[in-house]
Swiss-Prot record:
<feature type="signal peptide">
    <location>
        <begin position="1"/>
        <end position="26"/>
    </location>
</feature>
<dbReference type="InterPro" id="IPR018116">
    <property type="entry name" value="Somatotropin_CS"/>
</dbReference>
<dbReference type="GO" id="GO:0060396">
    <property type="term" value="P:growth hormone receptor signaling pathway"/>
</dbReference>
<dbReference type="InterPro" id="IPR034975">
    <property type="entry name" value="Somatotropin"/>
</dbReference>
<dbReference type="GO" id="GO:0048513">
    <property type="term" value="P:animal organ development"/>
</dbReference>
<dbReference type="GO" id="GO:0046872">
    <property type="term" value="F:metal ion binding"/>
</dbReference>
<feature type="disulfide bond">
    <location>
        <begin position="79"/>
        <end position="191"/>
    </location>
</feature>
<keyword id="KW-0732">Signal</keyword>
<dbReference type="InterPro" id="IPR009079">
    <property type="entry name" value="4_helix_cytokine-like_core"/>
</dbReference>
<dbReference type="InterPro" id="IPR001400">
    <property type="entry name" value="Somatotropin/Prolactin"/>
</dbReference>
<dbReference type="GO" id="GO:0005131">
    <property type="term" value="F:growth hormone receptor binding"/>
</dbReference>
<protein>
    <recommendedName>
        <fullName>Somatotropin</fullName>
    </recommendedName>
</protein>
<keyword id="KW-0479">Metal-binding</keyword>
<keyword id="KW-1015">Disulfide bond</keyword>
<comment type="similarity">
    <text>Belongs to the somatotropin/prolactin family.</text>
</comment>
<dbReference type="GO" id="GO:0005179">
    <property type="term" value="F:hormone activity"/>
</dbReference>
<keyword id="KW-0964">Secreted</keyword>
Length: 217
């Protein structure tokens, strides 16, 4: 038999048998520990970027007196995520199941898809990272995918299609260059840092519960 014919037959056999091979488990499933490691790396990258950018912006543009007045004013320091039901204490967090913590994390991530675009100039001018809003958006999308995969593993394996939050943060004027705009950008960075901290914390708890020897890392 000619080489080309043998190759064609082998390809046809492989395509015919592919569904059976999948059902029989011939393709190894990615370990849960690896999925959690990947999600944690992505969450930590976002949290670190949010924290460092917030701190850099604060040191460069926000006088101490403005910082304190901002943080003490509930109207300026209120984040959109406050409307998302999240655990308010360590005890409440521990009472949530792994799946609940993943769902909350997913909602927090999705709530930043549009708002992060309002910080394009801040990210572009950062001396620490020099990333664009599209880069941060891709980081968020990567983590969203990782969390969704974890949720599928913890459920019945069927994909979830939840509603994506499209908060616009309309109170932030990206075209303004005055001091008020600086405070608004500062507020947005404050909320981004706060929410990414929550996501990393929730994922760390899920990892600690699920993977032996992973607590404290």
């Amino acid at each position: 038999m000619a080489t080309g014919s043998r190759t064609s037959l082998l390809l046809a056999f492989t395509l015919l048998c592919l569904p059976q091979l999948k059902e029989a488990g011939a393709f190894p499933t990615i370990p849960l520990s690896r999925l959690l490691d990947n999600a944690m790396l992505r969450a930590h990258r976002l949290h670190q970027l949010a924290f460092d950018t917030y701190q850099e912006f604060e040191e460069a543009y926000i006088p101490k007196e403005q910082k304190y007045s901002f943080l003490q004013n509930p109207q300026t320091s209120l984040c959109f995520s406050e409307s998302i039901p999240t655990p308010a204490s360590k005890k409440e967090t521990q009472q949530k199941s792994n799946l609940e913590l993943l769902r909350i994390s997913l909602i927090l991530i999705q709530s930043w898809f549009e708002p992060v675009q309002l910080l394009r100039s801040v990210f572009a001018n950062s001396l620490l990272y020099g990333v664009s809003d599209s880069d941060v958006y891709e980081y968020l999308k990567d983590l969203e995918e990782g969390i969704q995969t974890l949720m599928e593993r913890l459920e019945d394996g069927s994909p979830r299609t939840g509603a994506i939050f499209r908060q616009t943060y309309s109170k932030f004027d990206i075209n303004s260059q005055n001091d008020d705009a600086l405070l608004k950008n500062y507020g947005l960075l404050y909320c981004f840092r706060k929410d990414m901290d929550k996501v990393e914390t929730f994922l760390r708890i899920v990892q600690c519960r699920s993977v032996e020897g992973s607590c404290g890392f």
